[in-house]
Amino acid sequence: MEKLVTIIQQFPLAARPYTAKDGTPMVFNSRGFLLTDGLDEFYAEMTGDTALACPDYDRTLLHRMQGCIKTRAYTDKNGTVRYENQVFITKLV
């Protein structure tokens, strides 16, 4: 997916430590964005090295966002299967 967006809010870098399957300590880096395309507002997340190298973007300009939408299924506390759409940013210029 590719969209022209305006950044409403850029959240700070979040680093979450975890242990890999082989026992190696790792860090998962992510940065969230609240974006609008002029009609809709949506939350998108940048992860990994892209999030680490992410500068502070000018919120007054239009930016070109490339990303993907993934659907995650989960079961709530009542046993109902629910779905959540997640937007991941692969490139933001």
Q: How would you label these PLM feature ranges?
A:
Residues 1-93:
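Single-stranded nucleic acid-binding surfaces, predominantly the OB-fold ssDNA-binding core
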